[in-house]
Amino acid sequence: MPMLPPVANALKRSETGAEETSEQDAVKRTKVLDMAQKVTRQIISSANAPGAIGPYSQAVRAGNTIYLSGSLGLDPKTGDLKEGVVEQTHQSLKNLGEVLKAAGADYGNVVKTTVLLQNIADFAAVNEVYGQYFKSPYPARAAYQVAALPKGGLVEIEAVAIAGEIEEVKN
């Protein structure tokens, strides 16, 4: 019998529990699994946010999930960093907002962010600005101090969002 992916191996037995032996059945099953696993991929970009400064996209939508690359506090018109961590945080989040808009989403669609800080002592100042863009229920988040950020940035924020209408479920 041909080697199948782990998911297909789990489906190797018939409803009665007897193992299927037909190679044709295995091929059919593999084709069905391949069709179920296909996901559309779309590159998202906005002229209203700074272009990528390396070989990557501003965002990629895979199925209903939108992955936004890290955003520095760069002015989209000049490419210059804003002054100070507060202004860089505002600009980083504005840039993310423009890319979200290009994807047909907004801050309410964001489910996860990662905040990279050049200095963890800026955590409170970044939180103050962050709370102006994201409202409760807040996205999941991680924040880290890093040794350095591109272009001498003080903060970089990346995000993951879900396309479409979000229905909140109360616990």
Curated annotation (Swiss-Prot):
Protein name (record): RutC family protein C23G10.2
Record organism: Caenorhabditis elegans
GO cellular component, one term: cytosol
GO annotation terms (biological process): mRNA catabolic process; negative regulation of translation
Entry's Gene Ontology molecular function annotations: deaminase activity
Family: Belongs to the RutC family.
Family matches, as PANTHER family: 2-IMINOBUTANOATE/2-IMINOPROPANOATE DEAMINASE RIDA, 2-IMINOBUTANOATE_2-IMINOPROPANOATE DEAMINASE
Location of the region described as Disordered in the Swiss-Prot/TrEMBL record: 1-25
Residue ranges of coiled coil: none
NCBIfam families linked: Rid family detoxifying hydrolase
